[in-house]
């Protein structure tokens, strides 16, 4: 078995359960094999640039700012600031009048649901656990997925201390060996970006009926 086969088995499980997911989500602090989401608004505005979302959050907080304010806050050149601001304006999120930037639409009250990331490995559970911890910056929960025959080699205390959950994969079935703990370091902006990427990946997918699954306890009601 290859790691790609393990990931494909997990993908199949998620599809059969009607769960939205994305593979190899690039977040700058690691690439999660699988990121899934429950409960986020399907009309979430897709924004995948950290500075873009950060600038929007800044304008939203201040209600109106100047190009200079943004330059000073984010230490960016004027042309770069204009590029970001005009992108936000084209999306209908801000309006520009001379050098003044005003918020038009607050997207930060939107429901982001629950985001879970998974690192899949065949044997290297220690490395996988370390990698999964990085995902807690943009996920509510993080798991390591291993083939069922590898589980016996794992020191569960390391997972318990780090808050990383553990999944056993056998064929296309998933069993939760250890539940994950909720992240205390999840950054809202990073979560917005990761969640919007999952939503964007599934925008053309017909809404599926969500079935009971190994992650059911995390589904928002």
Kindly give the residue locations of the regions a language model identified.
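Acidic-basic catalytic patches of nuclease active cores, encompassing PD-(D/E)XK
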Residues: 1-38, 47-100, 221
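Conserved catalytic cores of phosphodiester-cleaving nucleases, focusing on short active-site segments
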Residues: 10, 34-40, 114-122, 142
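Non-catalytic C-terminal interaction segments of nucleic acid-processing enzymes
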Residues: 12, 18, 26-28, 39-54, ...
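Amphipathic coiled-coil/heptad-repeat helices and related helical stalk/stem segments
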Residues: 81, 103, 128, 151-152
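Accessory beta->alpha helical hairpin/"wing" motif in late/C-terminal subdomains of nucleic-acid enzymes
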Residues: 99-110
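Nucleic-acid nuclease catalytic cores
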Residues: 124-125, 139-173
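Catalytic core segments in nucleotide and nucleic-acid processing enzymes
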Residues: 132
